[in-house]
Amino acid sequence: MARARSDSPLLFEIVEKPDFSFETKAMADGLWPVAGMDEAGRGPLAGPVVAAAVVLDPANIPEGLDDSKRLSHFQREALFLRILGSAQAVSMASISAEGIDGSNILKASLEAMRRALVGLSVRPKLALADGRDVPPGLPCDGRALIKGDQRSQSIAAASIVAKVMRDRMMCGCGSHHDRYGFEVHMGYATARHRTAIETHGPVARLHRVSFAPFRLGGTEVVEEESLAGLD
């Protein structure tokens, strides 16, 4: 239980943690394996959207699984390794900025999740997707869970894998395009990123030129210290 910031000392905020209840019920219904799916990178101005699909081992679930946005960088990195070492199957997929521009971010996110699921080494009987939409074309039954990364441990694991992989990809972009600071803001619309775009222009095939800032000439700036709360 976490204390909420308030003028009243008696006000508390209960922070719900994801559990394995959705997966356990599916197992009881004969729907196993169950995969969790999530993506990272819907909001940035640059870089890919990355998705992951994870089938956890019910007998070996890493402690501390949570929505990746509620974890620190170091917590995500540690859990990433534990997930890879304990899960029954893990798969990742990405859609490039060009692919996003060629459709839209929602379609690209759903397609990345579908590709990640198809890439699993086991064939799940049920896929749990974070959000409101089930990706079309899944090879199994699918269920969308709003705030699923805060409700299902399988989805939480997928959110961590997707976030860590995307951050690593953006750090690689930063080493190739050192004037933009991708390794700091991960492609989000921070003041530093906006200034770099205004000074040097967008990077071909890396910036999402279909996004409003490039079409309309402006966007809300995201402060770099707030990036921990973004996917």
UniProtKB/Swiss-Prot annotation:
Q: Name its cellular compartments.
A: Cytoplasm
Tell me where on the tree of life, at the top rank, the source sits: Bacteria
Which Gene Ontology MF annotations are present? manganese ion binding; RNA binding; RNA-DNA hybrid ribonuclease activity
Which reaction equation describes what this protein catalyses?
Endonucleolytic cleavage to 5'-phosphomonoester
Functional description taken from the UniProt entry: Endonuclease that specifically degrades the RNA of RNA-DNA hybrids.
Q: Which family does it belong to?
A: Belongs to the RNase HII family.
| Protein name (record) | Ribonuclease HII
